[in-house]
């Protein structure tokens, strides 16, 4: 006796398992991981989304919650498991997992604890998706991108840190607010380490090709009567402020990550400030990852733009690199 499905649907092609074209995996279903997931789904970037975490109930709940929204999405398959086999054939893997900094904990100690987590995660990712591109989001992102590159054995163009993509977006938003234009029309770059020692490239800030530093030569310096330097200070402090107010940041970083993924999956060759291996650039001698303007396309991070930086900006970049190396050189088991 034929089932209802057999009566309803007459097959034309043989049934076979299809390999997804644009599968994306998100590792870690905390606030940041789920913001990445919903941003990816909202932009219809993937034909299969896989979620992985160690907390099975939370993981299943998040998966079901997203699946129940399938009618409103263009992603036919949403899966989740604590076993990494669920991630097989991913084009892009987003790593948001990691331990949180405890009160009074040193950065080195936090990084070392995250290294121990990544030693389990990264080999599993590469085992099931040897051709994937990994985007590292977990903090401290620049050091953990280096750790991921070391542990994965992947070429450096396929290991990318979310880096200063969000810092630069915050910078452009805050400047645009002051000027009364849309952030997309206000161009400016934050480079270096994501966070406290980031570098605002004031020499490159422009609106419609007009260099703002030509209009106000003191822009970004301590002598500036309009105090534009405050904008960069606000960028650095903004995450701390949001965390103080709501406990964590997630929406903006989720949108930022989806933006990076779009550039790669759609082969756009857009330029983003993301964390890459900078050894040999700007006189940096060690194997550190920092944000520079990078071209992202289907192959990953394919080139770096040589920005004309002023001497003080180069000095700040080198300072960032030294800070990171100071922590990296003492990491164990890499």
Swiss-Prot record:
Substrate binds at residues 107, 139, 170, 249. Its main location: cytoplasm. GO terms for cellular component: mitochondrial inner membrane. It is a peripheral membrane protein. It catalyses: (S)-lactate + NAD(+) = pyruvate + NADH + H(+). It is found in: Cytoplasm; Mitochondrion inner membrane. This is L-lactate dehydrogenase B chain. It comes from Sus scrofa.
